[in-house]
């Protein structure tokens, strides 16, 4: 009895500390948010000029990360919304909506009146109601210099059948945040975690909210048991038994003034209704067997075949006294909730290329690209480990599966139906973090993300797919060469604070002009 009382008292103390920190962060960030709210309002004024929905064929979207890639519940389409891009001097944020037609291998830009404000690191969930709905909550907006942040707490729904945006206002919603996770569970949305940051302070969350899709009301859950510590960037999925898995994530703590210590979480928890009651939930810590991923942050997840959860990529940053070493990944892992077991994704390779691999490995050992990121029509996969050392001592290790150069991609035949059959055979997505994943008809799609080389951030715009039924080889649907992406060095000039509209996106024409000036790939 005494032990239980101590635990409850300790729990209440932690809640009070978190409440004080949230109040402190809120107070210090209020002025920043007021400044950014004016900027957001300016962009919303520009968006308000749209009076009708316009759908236009377009090239693939520009490089970005921390966007959302969702599967249309009724059509063979992927829906890309939002995201961010940094060119070394300015941060660009987007509220563009793109649709990728899987069968036709084409992109369409959909301009809809009164869209959500520009954002990244939000969450988007698709439900089948009413011909399909895309629900978007939270995310963040950044100043052009990337030093101030505004965290949204708004909820939007895109009605896919009518192509209209609607903001849904309801009391009791979660506080403003980004890096949270959200899933559809029965006729509810369930949201977990995230973080809120101002210039000097930050707070991470481990709270759980539900949004009822019938009554349009928020409720905060208070699960029993010991759940995850506060974190953002974790992964969240629904099990076949109706539970919800929380895995991994990232958080940091201040150890002394101006010194923070980050933690990459690799634990797993199960959240499920207690005794079948939807108003009472319980946390349980999980200890899966099998080969689990190495600790990392910035990894991505999607629901795969047989209700398994698929994990891809990420980065492991090792902080030392005078350097920061980052290792990026492009590996695949599967978690089977039915067996509570991890599996490492291994590709079989195309049957027709097995005899050519030995030669491919020999040729690959003779050279490789400094910033290689896949390639069309190559054969003979081999893993290459590269280290890039910057002037400041930063070491970035990139592990990549490359293929022998010199093989031209085969042209698409007229009788091919889908891009996963027609795309060029490639070694797959290069190592990256913060990529966007989606699975449709048993095919995994990986879009965008980023990796670092010294002080340079390379933002990606490539699109790859992998047939999860066959697990043979990746197909490159959209390619890019990171070498061609210009990086602008930091400057002490105050010119960055000018031309705010270009820095944050403006309208589409202004976006394209700004990216062309910065050398960014479209």
Swiss-Prot record:
Residues that bear Phosphoserine: 413, 418
InterPro entries documented for this protein: Kelch-typ_b-propeller (IPR015915), Kelch_domain_protein (IPR052588)
Region of interest (Disordered), residue spans: 1-33, 346-378, 402-432, 481-522
Biased composition (Basic and acidic residues): 11-24
Ranges: Kelch repeats: 77-129, 133-187, 188-241, 243-289, 308-361, 443-494
Entry keywords, A to Z: Kelch repeat, Phosphoprotein, Repeat
Pfam families: Kelch_KLHDC2_KLHL20_DRC7
Keyword Acyltransferase found: no
Compositionally biased intervals (Basic residues): 1-10
PANTHER family: KELCH DOMAIN-CONTAINING PROTEIN, KELCH DOMAIN-CONTAINING PROTEIN 4
Name of the protein described by the UniProt record: Kelch domain-containing protein 4
């Amino acid at each position: 009895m005494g032990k239980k009382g101590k635990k409850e008292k300790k729990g209440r103390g932690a809640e009070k500390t978190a409440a004080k920190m949230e109040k402190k962060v809120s107070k210090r960030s209020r002025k920043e948010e007021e400044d950014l709210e004016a900027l957001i309002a300016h962009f919303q004024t520009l968006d308000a000029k749209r009076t009708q929905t316009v759908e236009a064929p377009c090239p693939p979207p520009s490089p970005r990360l921390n966007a959302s890639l969702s599967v249309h519940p009724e059509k063979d389409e992927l829906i890309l919304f939002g995201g961010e891009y940094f060119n070394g001097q300015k941060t660009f944020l987007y509220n563009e909506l793109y649709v990728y037609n899987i069968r036709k291998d084409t992109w369409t830009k959909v301009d809809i009146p009164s869209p959500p404000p520009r954002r990244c690191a939000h969450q988007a969930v698709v439900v089948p109601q009413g011909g399909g709905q895309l629900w978007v909550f939270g995310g963040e907006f950044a100043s052009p210099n990337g030093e101030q942040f505004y965290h949204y707490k708004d909820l939007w729904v895109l009605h896919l059948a009518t192509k209209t945006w609607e903001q849904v206002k309801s009391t009791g919603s979660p506080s403003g945040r980004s890096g949270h996770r959200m899933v559809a569970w029965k006729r509810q949305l369930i949201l977990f975690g995230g973080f809120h940051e101002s210039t000097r302070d930050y707070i991470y969350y481990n709270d759980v909210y539900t949004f009822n899709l019938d009554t349009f009301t928020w409720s905060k859950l208070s699960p029993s048991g010991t759940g995850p510590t506060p974190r953002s960037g974790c992964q969240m999925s629904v099990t076949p038994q109706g539970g919800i898995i929380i895995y991994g994530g990232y958080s940091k703590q201040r150890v002394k003034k101006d010194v923070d210590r980050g933690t990459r979480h690799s634990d797993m928890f199960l959240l499920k209704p207690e005794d079948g009651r939807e108003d009472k939930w319980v946390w349980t810590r999980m200890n899966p067997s099998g080969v689990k991923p190495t600790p990392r942050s910035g990894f991505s997840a999607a629901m795969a075949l047989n209700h398994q959860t698929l994990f891809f990529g990420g980065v492991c940053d090792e902080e030392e006294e005078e350097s920061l070493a980052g290792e990026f990944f492009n590996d695949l892992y599967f978690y089977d909730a039915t067996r509570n077991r991890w599996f490492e994704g291994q590709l079989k390779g195309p049957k027709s290329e097995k005899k050519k691999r030995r030669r491919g490995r020999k040729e690959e050992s003779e050279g490789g690209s400094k910033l290689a990121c896949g390639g069309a029509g190559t054969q003979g996969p081999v893993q290459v480990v590269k280290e890039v050392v910057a002037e400041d001592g930063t070491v970035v290790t990139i592990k990549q599966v490359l293929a022998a150069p010199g093989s031209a991609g085969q042209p698409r035949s007229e009788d091919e139906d889908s891009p996963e059959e027609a795309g060029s055979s490639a070694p797959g997505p290069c190592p990256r973090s913060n990529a966007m994943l989606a699975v449709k008809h048993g095919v995994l799609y990986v879009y965008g993300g980023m990796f670092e080389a010294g002080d340079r951030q390379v933002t990606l715009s490539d699109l790859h797919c992998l047939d999860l039924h066959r697990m043979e080889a990746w197909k490159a649907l959209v390619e890019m060469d990171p070498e061609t992406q210009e990086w602008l060095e930091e400057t002490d000039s105050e010119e960055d604070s000018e031309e705010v509209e270009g820095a944050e996106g403006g309208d589409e024409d202004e976006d394209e002009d700004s990216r062309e000036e910065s050398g960014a790939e479209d």
